[in-house]
Amino acid sequence: LPALLFGVAALAGARREAGTWAHLIGLDLTERISRRSQYERWAGSYAWSVVRAAVLAVLALTGLNALLVAGRLAVEWTAVVTVAEAIGGGPLGGLLLALLQIGWLPTFTAWSIAWTAGPGFSVGADSLYSVFGATPATAPALPALGALPGTWSPWQLLLLAVPIGAGAVAGVWLLREGENHLDDWLHTRHGSRAVSLTLSTLALAVLTGLLTGLLLLVPLALTSGTLGLGALTDIGSHVWAVCAAVAGWVALGCAAGYLTALAVAGHRD
């Protein structure tokens, strides 16, 4: 342990002295970048901004759906407690059950993402929960599952605003970042501001949406699978359908957020 602490302290000191991790291992990225052409530098900064925007969209989507899960548990708390009381188990069993449900919270959040995106999720082969409709079925005796959505209501369509809103957050951030160099390139080539803005915004939105969907691929796959035989062989979301839907909604929100933020900035100027 002392050797580990000394090593970490020495590494931190060397990193502080070098200024960057690249300098620490003898690489001068600034000098390498300066040898690139203007278009290569634009492409690099553009790609990096899209990656960060997609990560931001994933974080926003996850946070909003975590709030939805918490809100749903609060609203259906009576049903949750009823299932817990039916299970019994005493103090120790109740504690273990509570810890089990806490461990399932990331899974519930992933299911909520699938729910708000449209394709939905299943808790059993005969069930489907989505903002477009619901087919409830008997669920495993886990208290938190007492908060599963019941019958479908038209107002649930409003929850499509969740992935669209996550995309809008990414779009606003992209404008503030100011790395939409494709717009600059198209404008110099065609001279039409309307054409360059339309095409560059479309490209930015599509790339951000696609990358957001790809980033969700692994988490959604990890929260889908089987819990046994029979009806419980189908648990979780249809991963590819959800990723495609998220990509579309985020792209829509990204374009809307980017153009809205641009209009607001232009109005202020």
Regions from the language model: what does each represent?
Residues A3, G44-T62, G94-G103, S196-L207:
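Alpha-helical transmembrane segments and their helix-start/interface "positive-inside/aromatic belt" motifs
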Residues L56-E76, T212-G225:
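Alpha-helical transmembrane segments and their membrane-interface junctions
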